[in-house]
């Protein structure tokens, strides 16, 4: 008979098995990353047990002496890294951060403009998620299919026509910078706020690459802190000082009661790492993405936007409809320890998200494991051998990845996937 304690050991073993599998895999999921041992240490701390409702110095709970200092430090580091007037580090996810900005700057029934999901927009920008929860009328940005980006000229005309309350940039399929500056004049004319969902590219922005939304005219830069930004899971809002009070109130008490204090500490540590190493890390991530795209293209894959050097972000996007079903291809790759995801492309039916034509790849995690351009040809070759040649490369991938088991771009040299066992 299985005892209750046996279940705890089963779960612990599954966690260990997961860590071992990730260490042996080429993880190319564009929305994931690994944290340093110092960030992991924060996540294991007593802060995970505590409550601190409200802002630092204005808590509704006692016992926050050190918690206040940690959050204040994290706020100051975030403002410094992104050169922002105000930062709120309490959102528990990127979607919660988006919702807070929606509540702070617009009302039910207001029109907004955002990317349609197959064009690259995040689900939280759509009627089925956060934007719909807020009750917005959602208009979509005109899209340039060839260049995989918003059509800037058509966008400006549509802003004047629709008069949106929020012009929302950013997305989850995100190869090139969005036309923030180009929207500014029209936004001012109709009284719209510009919001930039930088969840996927936050680490690139922090490193000084991709684009600089706050300098280009965005009122709010919002994102999750665990994709290209190598922190713990959570959200952040960076904004103009004039919006600070409304956004803070939308976060608490509006959407978050107690925020995750151990994640705030981890975010502060990750932000310090990015101040030190962010430029080098971001540049290498983008260089790796371009090189991987080039290698995949040379091997016969239909990698999008060859005429634009494929990408300016961490992402590489392929249309695999000419060689198979993306859903089946991604499963075959997973069986060979190559982890990525199927993805809707602009020409796909939004109702067929389970059977799209695209594959999305991200290079941020393998970059943090120490890979550079020279390794991208090997990664591409493994993908080709599975997808086009039908080979089993699982053992070869595990052997290949055994040389890349440590976290780079951090203050200490540590194992990336070590199971942190507490006795």
UniProtKB/Swiss-Prot annotation:
It is found in: Cytoplasm. Pathway: Amino-acid biosynthesis; glycine biosynthesis; glycine from L-serine: step 1/1. It comes from the Archaea. Optimum temperature is 60 degrees Celsius. It catalyses: 5,10-methylenetetrahydromethanopterin + glycine + H2O = 5,6,7,8-tetrahydromethanopterin + L-serine. Homodimer. This is Serine hydroxymethyltransferase.
């Amino acid at each position: 008979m299985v005892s209750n304690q046996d279940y705890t050991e089963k779960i612990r073993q599954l966690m260990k098995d997961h860590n071992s599998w990730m260490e042996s895999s080429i993880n190319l999921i564009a929305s994931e990353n690994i944290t340093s041992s110092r960030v992991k240490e924060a996540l294991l701390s007593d802060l995970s047990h505590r409550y601190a409702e409200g802002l630092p110095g204005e808590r509704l709970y006692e016992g926050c002496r050190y918690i206040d200092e940690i959050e204040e430090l994290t706020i100051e580091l975030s403002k410094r890294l992104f050169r922002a007037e105000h930062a709120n580090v309490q959102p528990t996810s990127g979607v919660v951060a988006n919702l807070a900005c929606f509540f702070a700057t617009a009302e039910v029934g207001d029109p907004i403009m955002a990317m349609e999901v197959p064009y690259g927009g995040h689900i939280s920008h759509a009627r089925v998620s956060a934007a719909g929860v807020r009750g917005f009328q959602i208009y979509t940005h005109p899209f340039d299919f060839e260049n995989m980006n918003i059509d800037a000229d058509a966008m400006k005309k549509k802003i004047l026509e629709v008069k949106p309350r929020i012009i929302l940039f950013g997305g989850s399929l995100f190869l090139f910078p969005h036309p923030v500056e180009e929207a500014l004049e029209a936004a001012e004319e109709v009284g719209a706020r510009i919001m930039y969902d930088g969840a996927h590219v936050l680490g690139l922005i922090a490193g000084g690459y991709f684009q600089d939304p706050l300098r280009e005219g965005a009122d709010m830069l919002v994102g999750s802190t665990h994709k290209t930004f190598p922190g713990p899971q959570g959200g952040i809002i960076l904004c103009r000082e004039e919006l600070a009070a409304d956004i803070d109130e939308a976060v608490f008490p509006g959407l978050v009661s107690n925020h995750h204090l151990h994640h705030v500490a981890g975010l502060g540590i990750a932000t310090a790492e990015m101040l030190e190493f962010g430029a080098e890390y971001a540049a290498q991530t983008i260089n790796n993405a371009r090189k991987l795209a080039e290698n995949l293209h040379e091997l016969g894959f239909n990698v999008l936007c060859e005429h634009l050097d494929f990408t300016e972000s961490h992402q590489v996007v392929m249309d695999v409809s000419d060689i198979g079903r993306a859903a089946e291809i991604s499963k075959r790759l997973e069986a060979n320890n190559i982890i990525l995801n199927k993805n809707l492309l602009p020409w796909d039916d939004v109702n067929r998200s389970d059977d799209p034509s695209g594959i999305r790849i991200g290079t941020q995690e393998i970059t943090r494991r120490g890979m550079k351009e020279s390794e991208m040809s090997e990664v591409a070759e493994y993908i080709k051998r599975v997808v086009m040649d039908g080979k089993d490369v699982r053992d070869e991938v595990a052997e290949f990845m055994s040389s890349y088991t440590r976290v780079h771009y951090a203050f200490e040299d540590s194992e990336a996937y070590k199971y942190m066992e507490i006795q």
